[in-house]
Amino acid sequence: RQEAETPEPSEPTVMEAYKKTTEVNPLNPYRFCADPTSVEYEGRLYVYGTNDQQEFDATGGLTSNTYGKIRSLVMMSTEDLVNWTYHGTIDMTTVCGQWLNASWAPSIVSREEADGKTHFYLYFSNSGGGVGVITSTSPLGPWTDPLGKNLISGSTPGLGLCSTPFDPGVVIDNDGSG
């Protein structure tokens, strides 16, 4: 009996322009979504992640990814963890402007504020040089930049030896403080 040879993986075809079929995201097969975070709102789970789309160029060729040019976050949601809706990306350059270097590893929380509305706070690593935050009263935006700068930077008191804060993890305590 002769064993069949396993063919070598090939470069993506035009139909696989953004990702190889062996490199799929189970939630969204044509989009990378690293470092996911999620929040539940009105029976729907909203997931946000680092948008690694530039790992392949427009023709499907591999490119070098230094992560320094990631300036958008991916959004998707589900009601049943089976069927997913892709909501596009948050263009962080448009929201944050000139102070943004890159946006990685988001972390989201929501809470009802004094105005009676649920507010969403989406924190992100700004290229390892700090942690920024954008806000919205909807899990899908529009998003605004309330500070115009990093919330936490390497010079923030109390960081000790952590001169490059990144990959935030945000929680809200039972008393409502965060």
Regions found by a protein language model. Give the residues of each.
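Carbohydrate-active catalytic/glycan-binding domains of CAZyme proteins
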Residues: E3-G178
